């Protein structure tokens, strides 16, 4: 076969294999025997081996897996992959529906099965698959393109030459999971606890051939750029994705109201065991994109969607002992040490006991048969005692009076249920602060997890976060299981963390009551650490959602000489102390009508998109939020303004129409 013939035949084979693969892996309706598919695949592989230049990015042979990767690159999600708020019962679902209707009126919902796998993003250019990434922290994930390419239900080429970014869930079917664990058991390897862990572990293999051997699957459940493509609803987006050749779960339903949603939830609670894959709940989304825009999002999750989690599985096991741990803020927490037991697909040996009052109220004793469940199917907790099983050998537990780490006296502050160690130099607190500082939500220092921090701390190499920026390769190589390459990578990650925006550093400092959302609000408002350090209590409380308790904690933190010294050291090492997001009041004209104002947009503007309006308001010193409250200063109402306008009228909030809005932003440009 000459090259011209080979080129024609390779194109024919790619078309045939794409069609047969789609019929088998997506439609589950194969039209040819497996042997015929394999024969055609072998023929294409032989042609590509003889003429390597004929190999294309969408060739079915690319699913077999290429050479191992050195490491996974970071990928920034243009549209964040936000997590969802949870619902645990019918009441939570009805509360969600009530909040939606208060904001946008009546709404239809789309219900989908919540696949228990790994959330991924897949990007296509002109119809060709070009990049896949993990969710990561929602803003930044890892490039797993080559591993996703091995999933046969994921199209390498779409049926239309469109550019898009889809979101989906990669998972391991139950049959594949059982087969994989049987193979690992035969080889004497550690078994995977559940299909979710197996899927996540497979997609994070540096060798794509390993991922290819694991028989993963993928359902697509969203389209990040749907509105750019002229699509107006989530249900329409799912139909469009399916028409392009994606595998979209057929077990979905558009519901006219919350009663239909609850019926769908109850139906799948019963039918769940019959599925060939694991699900842990139902995802409910407002169908209309226009209503989704109006509802907006919090810092953590969209207001237009919620994840109903199936009731947690409960099991009984023996409480062997109770361990007391000290957290980064000095809170002392009791942890149950259990006879190993499987709960919701994982082996559990430890569970939270919350606090001393909880142990006393439940009369939990060492040696008891205790009931364990996973809260939200994630955190194991002791929920009760099987008193009938007591034989008299059980031992009541008493919380210690002194810190188990530094032996300082434990105290209970007024109004709190937790015991605290108030020694700021307690080794446990210092260690936990370092772990928090390096965590994904804070400075995101890859490779600096609990084990490495503990080694560094025990070796006397670090005591506070500034010490991290003094570490050398020679010091790291001396640690257990830390080679030269690992040390180089860790130092690079520490160096990269210096460029983080202010909100990450602020959250990483571990100021009491300041979570990730509050850190974001403070960074946006003050823009530099210097301004925040100088802020008075009143200035702090002027920031939306910053209350008196948090303001007191922030001023107390910056009043400490140790905090001043720490920040000086971090500055000296080049750690960024400025907010890197969109600038607001610093660029606003002094007479801007928006300066320092909290603004809500509702309805449709004829002159610009909602995002463009938001940018204009922020340019002129305002802050845009998604819902109307007593802290709202101004509401801008376009056409078809809904319940937000009514609420603003009830609260006596100033309201502008579009013409007044345009007048002000044009004045701000002069």
From Swiss-Prot:
Membrane-spanning intervals of the chain: none
Family: Belongs to the NAD-dependent DNA ligase family. LigA subfamily.
Alphabetical keyword list: DNA damage, DNA repair, DNA replication, Ligase, Magnesium, Manganese, Metal-binding, NAD, Zinc
Binding-site positions, Zn(2+): 403, 406, 421, 426
Residues at the active site: 114
Organism from which the protein derives: Geobacillus kaustophilus (strain HTA426)
Protein name according to UniProt: DNA ligase
Cofactor: Mg(2+); Mn(2+)
CDD domains named in the record: BRCT_DNA_ligase_like, LIGANc
Disulfide bonding pattern of the chain: none
SUPFAM superfamilies given in the database record: BRCT domain, DNA ligase/mRNA capping enzyme, catalytic domain, Nucleic acid-binding proteins, RuvA domain 2-like
Gene Ontology MF terms: DNA binding; DNA ligase (NAD+) activity; metal ion binding
The UniProt record lists the keyword DNA repair: yes
Highest taxon of source: Bacteria
Gene Ontology CC: cytosol
Catalysis performed (reactions): NAD(+) + (deoxyribonucleotide)n-3'-hydroxyl + 5'-phospho-(deoxyribonucleotide)m = (deoxyribonucleotide)n+m + AMP + beta-nicotinamide D-nucleotide
């Amino acid at each position: 076969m000459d090259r011209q013939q080979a080129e024609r035949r390779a194109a024919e084979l790619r078309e045939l294999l794409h069609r047969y693969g789609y019929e088998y892996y997506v439609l589950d309706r194969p039209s040819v025997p497996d042997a015929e598919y394999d024969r055609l695949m072998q023929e294409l592989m032989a042609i590509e081996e003889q003429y390597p230049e004929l190999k294309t990015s969408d060739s079915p042979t690319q699913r077999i897996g290429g050479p191992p990767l050195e490491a996974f690159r970071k990928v920034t999600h243009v549209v964040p992959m936000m997590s969802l708020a949870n619902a645990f019962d019918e009441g939570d679902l009805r509360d969600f529906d009530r909040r939606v209707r208060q904001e946008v009126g009546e709404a239809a919902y789309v219900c989908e099965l919540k696949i228990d796998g790994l959330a991924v993003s897949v990007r296509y250019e002109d119809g060709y698959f070009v990049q896949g990434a993990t969710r990561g922290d929602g803003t930044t994930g890892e490039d797993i393109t080559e591993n996703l390419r091995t999933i046969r239900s994921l199209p390498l080429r779409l049926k239309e030459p469109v550019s898009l970014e889809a979101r989906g869930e990669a998972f391991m079917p139950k049959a594949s999971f059982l087969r994989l664990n049987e193979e690992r058991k035969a080889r004497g390897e550690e078994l995977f606890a559940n299909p979710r862990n197996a899927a996540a572990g497979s997609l994070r293999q540096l060798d794509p051939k390993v991922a290819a051997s694991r028989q993963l699957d993928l359902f697509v459940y969203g389209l990040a750029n749907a509105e750019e493509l002229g699509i107006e609803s989530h249900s329409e987006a799912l139909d469009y994705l399916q028409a392009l050749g994606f595998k979209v779960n057929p077990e979905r339903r558009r519901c006219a109201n919350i009663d239909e949603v609850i019926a769908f939830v109850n139906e799948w609670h019963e039918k769940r065991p019959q599925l060939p894959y694991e699900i842990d709940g139902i995802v409910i989304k407002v169908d209309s994109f226009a209503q989704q825009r109006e509802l907006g999002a919090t810092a953590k999750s969209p207001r237009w969607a919620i994840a109903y989690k199936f009731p947690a599985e409960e099991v009984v096991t023996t409480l062997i002992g109770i361990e007391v741990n000290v957290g980064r803020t000095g809170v002392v927490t009791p942890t149950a040490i259990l006879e190993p037991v499987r709960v919701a697909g994982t082996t559990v040996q430890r569970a939270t006991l919350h606090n001393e009052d909880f142990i006393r109220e439940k009369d939990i004793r060492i040696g008891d048969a205790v009931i364990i469940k996973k809260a939200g199917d994630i955190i194991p907790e002791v929920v009760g005692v099987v008193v009938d099983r007591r034989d008299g050998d059980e031992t009541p537990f008493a919380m210690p009076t002194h810190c188990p780490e530094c032996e300082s006296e434990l105290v209970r502050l007024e109004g709190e249920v937790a015991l605290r160690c108030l020694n700021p130099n307690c080794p446990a607190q210092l260690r936990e602060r370092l772990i928090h500082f390096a965590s994904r939500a804070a400075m995101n220092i890859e490779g600096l997890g609990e084990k490495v921090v503990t080694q560094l701390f025990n070796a006397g190499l670090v005591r506070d976060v500034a010490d991290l920026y003094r570490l050398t390769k020679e010091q790291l190589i001396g640690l257990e299981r830390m080679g030269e390459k690992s040390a180089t990578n860790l130092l690079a990650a520490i160096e990269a963390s210096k460029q983080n925006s202010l909100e990450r550093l602020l959250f990483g400092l571990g100021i009491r009551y300041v979570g990730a959302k509050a850190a974001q609000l403070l960074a946006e408002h003050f823009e530099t650490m210097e301004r925040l350090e100088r802020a008075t209590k009143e200035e702090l409380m002027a920031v939306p959602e910053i209350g008196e308790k948090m303001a007191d904690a922030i001023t107390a933190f910056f009043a400490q000489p140790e905090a001043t010294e720490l920040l000086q050291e971090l500055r000296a090492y080049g750690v960024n102390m400025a907010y890197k997001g969109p600038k607001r009041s610093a660029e606003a004209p002094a007479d801007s009508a928006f300066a320092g104002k909290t603004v809500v947009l509702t309805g449709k503007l004829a002159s610009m998109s909602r995002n463009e309006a938001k940018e204009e308001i922020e340019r002129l010193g305002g802050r845009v939020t998604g819902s109307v409250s007593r802290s709202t200063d101004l509401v801008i109402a376009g056409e078809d303004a809904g319940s937000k306008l009514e609420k603003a009228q009830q609260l006596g909030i100033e309201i502008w129409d579009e013409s007044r809005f345009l007048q002000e932003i044009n004045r701000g440009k002069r």
